[in-house]
């Protein structure tokens, strides 16, 4: 599948990866929500309920088990080997 199809798949709750990725590396969708302000900076921008709103994003579960924001490189944008897992 291409990247557009992959985005639709993860927005429906699936995990996705490139066929060439190894280990436990995959992408998933994180919907917009909010979190409790913990730092002074976050507290300076929190809403009335003490939370900071964030926008939807794609997260990547890395081989080391940690999660990060995903920004697609050129090779991923034009790939046709995306698959759901």
What is each model feature region?
Residues 54-85:
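Short, compact, well-ordered microdomains
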Residues 1-62:
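Extended non-catalytic interaction/regulatory regions in multidomain proteins
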